[in-house]
Amino acid sequence: MQVIIISGLSGSGKSIALKALEDSGYYCVDNLPASLLVILINHLQTQHHSHVAVAIDMRSGDSITVLPWQFKMIDKSIRTEFIFLDTRTDTLIQRFSETRRRHPLSDKNITLEEAIQHEREVLATVSDLGHHIDTSSLRPNALRAFIRDFISDSRDPSQLTLMFQSFGYKHGIPLDADLVFDIRCLPNPFYDPHLKELTGHDLEVIRFMEAQPNAAKMLGDIGSFLDTWLPVYMQDNRAYLTVAIGCTGGQHRSVYFAEKLALHFRDAARVLVRHRGLAEYNQYYARR
């Protein structure tokens, strides 16, 4: 039996993620009180459900605070994954404004921003239970793609998920980054008129980067650092590790580095790649 638990801030994309799992054949339960998690799983196991997804959030009230304990009480024979969706406050305010939806914690006595902050503080107790995903700049189809890749990975579920994420500093550091490497000191293909409109996926940019001695040295140093410390992270029983590579715009250098590193570590962990700065590539995909 496989169980995927989804939690996160209101407006972060939980409904989209749950619908993607339902479309993939999962038996889905939305807005479950956290205190009923183990009871539900045990019941569904007796009903021979093999794939189950459950969404638990602040709509269930203060019972969300017991989720860490409930999570630990799940039978160890059941493959269990936890996904926490996070989003920047300014993005959440914009989403609620555009959809004209009411935040579940808002009332006439507090502002929307205050409601979001309160929810963030309460959910801090559960945000580190598993895969922490920043959906601030993630489009719905990209979130669906991440879910599809996540459930299609047949590797050992206890194996650490290693995510390489390229980004542009002009849009801020990703919320879900565990390690951040700044490569803005390297020559920028953006200033070459022939490369300006291309990306780190294009052969011309790849050749440009490969011709830079410092780029090769920095790539090797980052790879060596991860070669040394990745086993230590694994021994710490971490479920995931997000490595963010940042350049100015997230179009050329960081994309090249993320792809190279993902290729290097594809046999060492469950590897995912995301290019936050590329609209057409703003999605997660598995590197196999």
Swiss-Prot record:
InterPro entries: P-loop_NTPase, RapZ-like, RapZ-like_N, RapZ_C. Pfam families: PapZ_C, RapZ-like_N. GTP binds at residues 57-60. ATP binds at residues 8-15. Keywords: ATP-binding, GTP-binding, Nucleotide-binding. GO terms for molecular function: ATP binding; GTP binding. It comes from the Bacteria. Displays ATPase and GTPase activities. HAMAP family: RapZ_like. PANTHER family: RNASE ADAPTER PROTEIN RAPZ. This is Nucleotide-binding protein Neut_1559. It comes from Nitrosomonas eutropha (strain DSM 101675 / C91 / Nm57).
